[in-house]
């Protein structure tokens, strides 16, 4: 078992500290049978979705303004 621990932590020695922290949290949740795992990887996705949605809304508004001005003038 000591060799297993040494191998697991040896992998994370050259890695970022966040990776080790996430790994420890996952191991804790598995050992304690918790259903919630704190993960910071998915929080950035919602920002991209909102950015894409806002981009398309602005694009549609610009198209509608262009068509309106084309008809009025």
From Swiss-Prot:
It is found in: Virion membrane. The chain crosses the membrane at residues 49-69. GO terms for cellular component: membrane; virion membrane. Keywords: Late protein, Membrane, Transmembrane, Transmembrane helix, Viral penetration into host cytoplasm, Virion, Virus entry into host cell. One of its GO terms (biological process) is symbiont entry into host cell. The keyword Calcium does not apply. The keyword Ribonucleoprotein does not apply. It comes from the Viruses. It is a single-pass membrane protein. Pfam families: Pox_EPC_I2-L1. Its main location: virion. Belongs to the orthopoxvirus OPG078 family. Late protein which probably plays a role in virus entry into the host cell. This is Protein OPG078. It comes from Monkeypox virus.
